[in-house]
C-alpha cells in the first residue's frame, strides 16, 4: 500500500469505529436533523445518562465528526464543518 492509501484506510477505520455504535449513530442523525444541541438535549432523546452521552460525544469529537462550543455553562455540539472525506461520505448515507 502507498502512504496515501494507508492514510485513507486509517481515516476510514477511525470514522467507522466511532460510528460503530447505535447510540453514536443516533447522535449523528439527531444533529443532522437539528443542527446543534446540548449534551442534555441529546441525552434525553437517546435515553442515556449525561455521563454516557458525554462519553459518546467525546468519541465522535475525537474522530472529527462533531465539534463543540462552550456557551455559558453548557456544551453545545454540532456536526463538524471540517469533516474528513471518510466521515462526510458516511454521514451522507445516514
Task: Please annotate each region the language model reported.
Residues 62-71, 78:
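Beta-hairpin "wing" of winged helix-turn-helix
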Residues 22-25, 34-38:
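Short capping segments at the starts of secondary-structure elements
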Residues 2-3, 11-12, 33, 74-94:
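Conserved segment of winged-helix/HTH DNA-binding domains
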Residues 17-20, 29-33:
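Short, locally clustered residues in the helix-turn-helix/winged-helix DNA-binding domain
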Residues 51:
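Key DNA-contact positions within bacterial/archaeal DNA-binding proteins
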Residues 41-43:
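A short acidic, leucine-rich amphipathic alpha-helix
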Residues 17-23, 80-83:
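Short helix-coil-helix linker/hinge
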Amino acid at each position: 500500500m502507498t502512504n496515501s492509501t494507508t492514510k485513507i484506510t486509517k481515516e476510514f477505520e477511525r470514522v467507522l469505529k466511532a460510528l460503530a455504535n447505535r447510540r453514536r449513530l443516533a447522535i449523528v442523525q439527531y444533529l443532522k436533523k437539528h443542527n446543534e444541541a446540548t449534551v442534555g438535549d441529546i441525552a434525553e432523546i437517546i435515553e442515556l445518562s449525561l455521563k454516557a452521552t458525554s462519553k459518546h460525544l467525546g468519541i465522535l469529537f475525537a474522530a472529527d465528526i462533531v465539534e463543540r462550543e462552550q456557551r455559558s455553562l453548557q456544551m453545545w455540539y454540532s456536526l463538524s464543518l471540517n469533516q474528513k472525506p471518510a466521515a462526510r461520505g458516511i454521514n451522507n448515507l445516514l
